[in-house]
Amino acid sequence: MPEVDVRLERVTKLFGEVAAVDDLSLDIATNEFFSLLGPSGCGKTTTLRVIGGFEDPTYGTVYLGGRDVTDLPPYQRDVNTVFQSYALFPHLDVYENVAFGLRRKKVEKSEIDRRVTEALRLVDLAGFERRKPGKMSGGQQQRVALARALVNRPRVLLLDEPLGALDLKLRKQMQLELKTIQQEVGITFIYVTHDQEEAMTMSNRLAVMRHGRIEQLGAPEDVYEHPATEFVAGFLGASNLLDGEVSSLNGRAQIRLSSGETVVAGDPSIDAGVGSSVRVGVRPEKISIVSQEEPAASGRNHVDGTVRLATYIGVNYQYRVDGPGGRQLTVFVQNQGAAGSHPSVGQRVRLEWLPEHTFVVEPSGESLDQEEEER
């Protein structure tokens, strides 16, 4: 069992009568790249601030490396934080910005030089030692902020949406660089973001948060492929959801849709009995779109529909299809360069997908139209 670097035990943080974090318990393993993911106001940043000591929990306990640090200020915790605002000293060059914390700790000059040089190598800024922050790009400044945190060799590095101010291309580049750096230095990274792709790209595990609680926790591929709740299905990537009722649990769950069709879910362990109302989901990229004139493929779920919108994105084609009960379904088809083989607007089509790509979640209590408006 991996060693735990960070443990939260039943942590609650109240602001007035509002619970920004609500009875949250969580273990984060040593050397893990862990992301707190969720929409604005879900409690992810407050959770990070509680770990760092910038907010005191109203209730609960915070452990770092097995030590109770709940009542310790930030400077007595073995953590460093990188914020979206780089907070660099404009009058100091790169070297002195990175060395600042070490000088305050009165580290020997030779050790400072060695550690600053190594930190700048890690973030690919060797040769920039004497440059001022004002002469650097946003991506370079973010690297300086990261080097300044890493040079202190903290047990845990907290990152609060550090890439949010960068443009899309640079943000994607920095995602891969952060993951590479984390693997090289072997420090536990705890990363806060609202960007689903960012969290899935970098994380060993992630927690999807909502209303101060964790909706689902796990490896990115597990959470994406097997969402536990309707919220997770809609927040972490795109999903198509249809209302139905469990009609059979003989090996595989059979669900009769409200529009009359029957689909099969590959997971036999769904938490619903025969007769239960459920919502059936499938990701857009899991669906094949074919002409209704073609025979239906055996062993696959299928529903009929009419193409209402076709969009060329470059890497794929995206379709909106009027499906069962008037529900609009989204389909992503990989662009493989076959000209003339794509359905057109107004065409009657069949949507097909494998049972193992079907997931089942409990209805939220709101209509699917309301759910889409919220997302």
Where are these regions (language model features)?
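Conserved coupling/switch loops of ABC nucleotide-binding domains, chiefly the family-specific signature
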Residues: T58-T61, E111, H211, D243
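Helix-to-loop junction immediately C-terminal to a conserved catalytic motif
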Residues: G52
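Conserved ABC transporter NBD signature motif
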Residues: G60-D68
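Pre-Walker A (P-loop) beta-loop-beta motif of ABC nucleotide-binding domains
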Residues: L24-S35, F89
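The feature captures the beta-strand-to-loop junction immediately N-terminal to the Walker
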Residues: L37-P39
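Non-catalytic connector elements of ABC transporters
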Residues: S239, S248-R375
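ABC ATPase nucleotide-binding domains
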Residues: F33, L72-G234
